Amino acid sequence: MSIKSDKWIRYMAQAHGIIEPFEPRQIREANNARIISYGTSSYGYDIRCSNEFKIFTNINSAVVDPKNFDASSFVDVQSDVCIIPPNSFALARTVEYFRIPRSVLTICLGKSTYARCGIIVNITPLEPEWEGHVTLEFSNTTPLPAKVYANEGVAQVVFFESDELCETSYRDRSGKYQGQTGVTLPKA
């Protein structure tokens, strides 16, 4: 299994639509202002979060249960900035829609800009033949409110290609998050 370069990422995005919309280079500025970078990097792709957020709140004194998650535990927000309460979290989705080839597995890692502020981005691997918008989880580990910026870089996707095809892909086993298009809550 080998890590894939910027050349491979550009080719696969442009010829096979594995990332849409796709930015073939790193973008570090918008409207004459510095932003948290996104786009193609040397050995990965820096993804953006959309302006759709679900901010966790415990107004109902709920117990967090991944098998029976209470959707009313979230407040829906559409904004260019998400303010996450202290020691809480928010969900969002990527701007980019992914179509992962059968021979590829991706690992997603949070950007250091957020990590150095106590904001942790958690994303599970994108499995072979999975497709959809990626649901992002932002944990604010600080005792203060924390900002996440929409349409700017939040994490990096690193692509690994296997030397042989898997027997069963995410699509083959009808994965429960296949084709997701919005911020998707846990499914048991």
From Swiss-Prot:
<feature type="binding site">
    <location>
        <position position="170"/>
    </location>
    <ligand>
        <name>dCTP</name>
    </ligand>
</feature>
<dbReference type="GO" id="GO:0015949">
    <property type="term" value="P:nucleobase-containing small molecule interconversion"/>
</dbReference>
<dbReference type="GO" id="GO:0006229">
    <property type="term" value="P:dUTP biosynthetic process"/>
</dbReference>
<comment type="similarity">
    <text>Belongs to the dCTP deaminase family.</text>
</comment>
<keyword id="KW-0547">Nucleotide-binding</keyword>
<feature type="binding site">
    <location>
        <position position="156"/>
    </location>
    <ligand>
        <name>dCTP</name>
    </ligand>
</feature>
<dbReference type="GO" id="GO:0008829">
    <property type="term" value="F:dCTP deaminase activity"/>
</dbReference>
<feature type="binding site">
    <location>
        <begin position="135"/>
        <end position="137"/>
    </location>
    <ligand>
        <name>dCTP</name>
    </ligand>
</feature>
<dbReference type="InterPro" id="IPR036157">
    <property type="entry name" value="dUTPase-like_sf"/>
</dbReference>
<dbReference type="GO" id="GO:0000166">
    <property type="term" value="F:nucleotide binding"/>
</dbReference>
<dbReference type="GO" id="GO:0006226">
    <property type="term" value="P:dUMP biosynthetic process"/>
</dbReference>
<comment type="subunit">
    <text>Homotrimer.</text>
</comment>
<feature type="binding site">
    <location>
        <position position="180"/>
    </location>
    <ligand>
        <name>dCTP</name>
    </ligand>
</feature>
<feature type="binding site">
    <location>
        <begin position="111"/>
        <end position="116"/>
    </location>
    <ligand>
        <name>dCTP</name>
    </ligand>
</feature>
<keyword id="KW-0546">Nucleotide metabolism</keyword>
<comment type="pathway">
    <text>Pyrimidine metabolism; dUMP biosynthesis; dUMP from dCTP (dUTP route): step 1/2.</text>
</comment>
<feature type="active site" description="Proton donor/acceptor">
    <location>
        <position position="137"/>
    </location>
</feature>
<dbReference type="InterPro" id="IPR011962">
    <property type="entry name" value="dCTP_deaminase"/>
</dbReference>
<dbReference type="Pfam" id="PF22769">
    <property type="entry name" value="DCD"/>
</dbReference>
<keyword id="KW-0378">Hydrolase</keyword>
<dbReference type="InterPro" id="IPR033704">
    <property type="entry name" value="dUTPase_trimeric"/>
</dbReference>
<protein>
    <recommendedName>
        <fullName>dCTP deaminase</fullName>
        <ecNumber>3.5.4.13</ecNumber>
    </recommendedName>
</protein>
<comment type="function">
    <text>Catalyzes the deamination of dCTP to dUTP.</text>
</comment>
